[in-house]
Design a protein with these regions (language model features):
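Juxta-kinase regulatory segment immediately upstream of eukaryotic protein kinase catalytic domains
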Residues: 2-33
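Helical subdomain adjoining the active site within ATP-dependent kinase catalytic cores
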Residues: 288, 292-299, 310-355
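Activation of the activation-loop gatekeeper triad in protein kinase-fold domains
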Residues: 236-241
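All-alpha amphipathic helical-bundle segments outside canonical DNA-binding/catalytic cores
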Residues: 165-166, 296-307
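ATP-binding pocket architecture of kinase catalytic cores
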Residues: 36-195, 199-212, 226-230
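Active-site activation/catalytic loop segments of kinase-like enzymes and analogous catalytic loops
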Residues: 248-293, 307-325
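Catalytic-loop of the protein kinase fold
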Residues: 212-214, 219
Length: 355
């Protein structure tokens, strides 16, 4: 399956790196590498930007905040680097980081370097020519949720990550914070937004347990083994990880997971091959998680409501940068439609309690 490996591409206009400063910086820290510096960009991300750097025989990956970012807390490179520097040893899918640079003089923003993880990333459309039977899709669904459970069971205190977040009052702060972020980045009037915010405040569940949570767990953040796509070898995009209620992580995974029986408009929100024959449904994911962990998932509809609202806010924040002229990436122009879809889906879940 090596033909389906994820590869970097040409750098998007407006997201070029200043090689006159990056090149000498790299040679200072990797003095034994000869040859010219080659830079390409991984094209899929909408948040932090990811580049492939080839310096002689050495390949590294560079992560930096988006250009024109308004939301600094969502792009804290030093925090992400610190988490990964402790996490990789106890949770192998986390990338191995190499170097952090907090000097804005180099690239205009902090960044860090990490080892590349080669493999297959599955997105809303399978790579042309990649097919797998229903039993593989089912095993992949199991691996998807088992890997999340593995993360939630990880002893974050032993890993030195106790100070990463404040679990007390986590869910209440999240609801309040994401509500504030939505209205700070608001560009259109969607009546569902205020209704959802009020409903969540009135229906906050009591948090039963605490764990390290990724906060953006979905297929296109997973790297799969090129020889066995049911084996997860990497988990990317840790900028929102924290200590909190693990059911918020499960809710996020469900928000990205579109069932084959969902309405046609919901199919536009699919972030992975979740409608492949043999794949779990959202209900099966919840059942599997509850069976393996013993967690009470009776209020999972709240967590899905919140997760869909949170995704709407994230998309709205990205669109806000485009709306304000802070980025020219044309992919962002149609994002209000996605915001509206997510808000409608969130409100429907709140009203029906159906996942």
């Amino acid at each position: 399956m090596s033909d389906f490996l994820d590869h970097p591409a040409r750098i998007r206009q407006g997201e070029e790196l200043d090689l006159t400063k990056l090149d000498p910086y790299l040679r200072e820290h990797f003095p034994n590498e000869a040859g010219s510096l080659q830079v390409r960009q991984y094209p899929s991300g909408h948040s932090n930007l990811t580049y492939s750097l080839q310096l002689g025989a050495r390949e590294v990956v560079l992560r930096r905040p988006p250009f024109g970012s308004k939301v600094k807390s969502a792009h804290d490179m030093s925090r992400e680097y610190r988490v990964l520097s402790k996490l990789h040893a106890v949770y192998s899918p986390a990338p191995e980081v190499l170097l952090y640079c907090g000097d804005d003089e180099v690239l205009g923003a902090p960044f860090y370097l990490m080892q590349p993880i080669h493999g297959i990333i599955l997105r809303h459309r399978l790579p042309p020519g990649l097919e797998f039977p229903a039993e593989t899709a089912r095993r992949l669904s199991e691996s998807f949720i088992e890997n999340l459970i593995r993360l939630h069971r990880m002893d974050y205190q032993a890993a030195g990550l106790s100070d990463l977040g404040k679990p007390e009052g986590y869910l209440e702060r999240q609801v309040r914070g994401w509500t504030d972020r939505y209205f700070a980045a608001k560009t259109h009037d969607y009546p569902e937004a205020q209704k959802i915010a009020a409903w969540m405040q009135e229906h906050l569940p009591v948090t039963a347990c605490t764990s390290l949570i990724h906060n953006d767990y979905k297929y296109d953040n997973l790297i799969l083994d090129s020889q066995d796509i049911t084996k997860i070898v990497g988990l990317l995009d840790w900028e929102m990880c924290t200590i909190g209620d693990p059911l918020t992580d499960l809710g996020t995974a469900l928000a990205y997971w579109i069932d084959a029986t969902d309405p046609e408009e919901m199919q536009h929100l699919r972030w992975g091959p979740t409608t492949q024959p043999g794949s779990f449904t959202r209900a099966e994911i919840v059942q599997y998680y509850a069976r393996q962990t013993g967690c009470d998932t009776s209020q999972i509809a709240f967590y899905l409501t919140f997760a869909r609202f949170k995704l709407a806010v994230i998309v709205q924040q990205i669109y806000y940068r485009y709306h304000q002229g802070l980025t020219t990436d044309k992919r962002f122009a149609s994002m209000p439609e996605r915001v509206q879809l997510l808000l409608r889906a969130s409100w429907e879940c709140a009203q029906t309690q159906h996942i």
